[in-house]
Amino acid sequence: MAENFGKVIQISGPAVDVQFSETTLPEIYTALRVVSEGFDVPTPINVVLEIQQHLGEGRVRCVAMEPTEGMVRGMKAIDMGGPISVPVGRGTLGRVMNVIGEPVDQLGPIMVEKRNPIHRQAPAFDEQATTAEMFETGIKVIDLIQPFLKGGKIGLFGGAGVGKTVVIQELINNVAKQHGGFSVFGGVGERTREGNDLWLEFTEAGVITPGDPSKSKAALVYGQMTEPPGARLRVALTALTVAEYFRDEEGTDTLLFIDNIFRFTQAGSEVSTLLGRMPSAVGYQPNLATEMGELQERITSTKRGSVTSVQAIYVPADDLTDPAPATTFAHLDATTVLSRALTEIGIYPAVDPLGSTSRILDPRIVGQEHYDVAQGVKGILQQYKDLQDIIAILGIDELSEDQKLTVSRARKIQRFLSQPFHVAEQFTGFPGRYVKIADTVRSFREILQGKHDEIPEQAFYMKGTIDEVHEAAEKMKANA
């Protein structure tokens, strides 16, 4: 096929207009590469654009995936023959790439046999797995209170420093060791410093081994705050495309992390304004629900494997009715809320069991026993929360015997919801624990039944199963 060329005729920041012949007009979402060949410019130009609109008379309006500084009218735009394509496969593990699939970790080219387009159809109805199945994470508080749906979408809410990254690292570690699966991290409009910190932490924790895909469990795809809005809008699709390959071609259960899904919406709003679309409510793009749906509907379980996504969600001005978070909520199967109040008393992971929810905490999916134990745990923690004002004003001695027992069990449950993580061993000094769901349900059932009322609450802190609590209690007795 002969190469198809166009010419740059207008540049408005990240929006670039290109003139083609009417007979060779490329399709919407086709990638173009603008080069400075034949132009005397200080820095050579090699910028990828994506066609967003056909303006008529052979003109197309594109959005740049890289900065357009130095680009001038008249430069050649090469039709790449299809949408942006990115490397997929095991060669991406342990590597950091950008929105167009180029490595940014200075470890040389990404060695893969295949590249896939970032724009793809969601799996058809007949390809999707129809059974609702729980995804075991090995983290007690998540598995018990807000179980993840295999192939589902989970919202992770939390401010700075409450442990979002550590929860993400542990999930990546557990999915690799227990499920033999892979993880893909999509940094959407995040701070460059945070991306660098995550890369270093993953390396130290052994989640990735730079330059050795066989020893790495995660691929990283970054589009930082400094990138043009086009890159921030499309980087989530790049990360999803990498994850889809592991689901469809390797048949694995894959984890996809998106941090932050709000910035995907924010970038879409910027692009929409650049393209001259009429804004809708609160200034967001009119196609907000469509853009979100196109991304979220591709995250699902098929008969071959699953992509389970954990999405960090920023809520502007803590307003949950804002169109950006409200549109995201419509797609979520579970919400995990990290609480600063729990970090202040040293409970890690700092997941708020009363603020977190899951669609599959249902006796028909997780079983009657799991459901009853989870509701019992939430009930006793709620009673403890209701009694805290009385305790603060009058003291614990003013409570009835039943209330004192409730407080005692609630404090044990609260401490037992803490858990040592494999990826945090060097900080906590506790060896990491992966707790199977059967052990989690059994342990909490026994606490609710009062079988461990005589054990001091200190013995429950940073333990895996109830058997470890017994061992700690025996040691405490022996040392007393």
From Swiss-Prot:
InterPro entries: AAA+_ATPase, ATP-synt_VA_C, ATP_synth_F1_bsu, ATPase_a/bsu_AS, ATPase_alpha/beta_chains, ATPase_F1/V1/A1_a/bsu_N, ATPase_F1/V1/A1_a/bsu_N_sf, ATPase_F1/V1/A1_a/bsu_nucl-bd. One of its GO terms (molecular function) is proton-transporting ATP synthase activity, rotational mechanism. GO terms for cellular component: plasma membrane; proton-transporting ATP synthase complex. Pfam families: ATP-synt_ab, ATP-synt_ab_N, ATP-synt_VA_C. It is found in: Cell inner membrane. It is a peripheral membrane protein. ATP binds at G158, G159, A160, G161, V162, G163, K164, T165. Keywords: ATP synthesis, ATP-binding, Cell inner membrane, Cell membrane, CF(1), Hydrogen ion transport, Ion transport, Membrane, Nucleotide-binding, Translocase, Transport. Gene3D superfamilies: 2.40.10.170, Bovine Mitochondrial F1-atpase, Atp Synthase Beta Chain, Chain D, domain 3, P-loop containing nucleotide triphosphate hydrolases. It catalyses: ATP + H2O + 4 H(+)(in) = ADP + phosphate + 5 H(+)(out). It is an enzyme of class 7 (translocase). The keyword Ion transport applies. Its EC number is 7.1.2.2. The keyword Nucleotide-binding applies. Belongs to the ATPase alpha/beta chains family. F-type ATPases have 2 components, CF(1) - the catalytic core - and CF(0) - the membrane proton channel. CF(1) has five subunits: alpha(3), beta(3), gamma(1), delta(1), epsilon(1). CF(0) has three main subunits: a(1), b(2) and c(9-12). The alpha and beta chains form an alternating ring which encloses part of the gamma chain. CF(1) is attached to CF(0) by a central stalk formed by the gamma and epsilon chains, while a peripheral stalk is formed by the delta and b chains. This is ATP synthase subunit beta. The lineage of its organism: Bacteria, Pseudomonadati, Acidobacteriota, Terriglobia, Terriglobales. The gene is atpD.
